[in-house]
From Swiss-Prot:
Family to which the UniProt record says this protein belongs: Belongs to the universal ribosomal protein uS4 family.
GO cellular component: plastid; small ribosomal subunit
Domain S4 RNA-binding: 94-155
The species this protein was found in: Helicosporidium sp. subsp. Simulium jonesii (Green alga)
Protein name in UniProt: Small ribosomal subunit protein uS4c
Pfam families referenced in this protein's UniProt entry, alphabetically: Ribosomal_S4 (PF00163), S4 (PF01479)
Keywords, alphabetical: Plastid, Ribonucleoprotein, Ribosomal protein, RNA-binding, rRNA-binding
Amino acid sequence: MGRYRGPRLRIIRRLGDLPLFTKKKPHIASKRLPLGHPVRKIKRRPSIYGLRLLAKQRCCYSYGLRDYQLKNYIKKARNAQGDPIKNLIFLLESRLDSKIYRSGIVSTMAAARQLITHGHVLVDNIKITIPSYSCNESQILDYKNTKLTSELIEKIKLSFNPIYVLEYYAIKL
C-alpha cells in the first residue's frame, strides 16, 4: 500500500482546504448537487469521534501518511518528554519531504516526495530517496546539479522578497 493517488478535489471538498495536499480549489458551482439527487438534509453536529476522525484524516492527507505511520508518530510523540502535540508536530516537520516543501522549492508535499524519490536531494552529500527520512537541524540539505533543480532554484530567486522576511521576523518578535 502506498500513499493516496485518487481524486484530490473530492478530498478537499470533504475535509476543507489542505494547502500541503494540493493547490487546487473546488469551483463554487461544484457544491450543487447534480440533477435527480434529493435535496440535502440539515447536517447534524458531528460527534467527538467524527471530529477526531476528521482531524486524523486531515493530518494524514496533508503529510501524505498512512494510518499506521501516523500511529507510530503518535506513539513516539507520547513517549518523548514534553507536550505530545508539539512533539508530534516536530516529528512531522522534521521529515525530509516536509523540509523540502517548507524550503519553497516545490508547491505541494507530493511534489517534494517526487523530487526526493527521483534522487534530486542530497543530505550531507549523500543521496537520500526516502521521503520519511528524519532530518536534524545540523544536517545540510542540498540538491543535485541538474536542469530541473537549477530551474526550480532560479524560480525561487525570482520570487524572493526580503521585505516579507523582515515582516515575518518583526511579527515574531
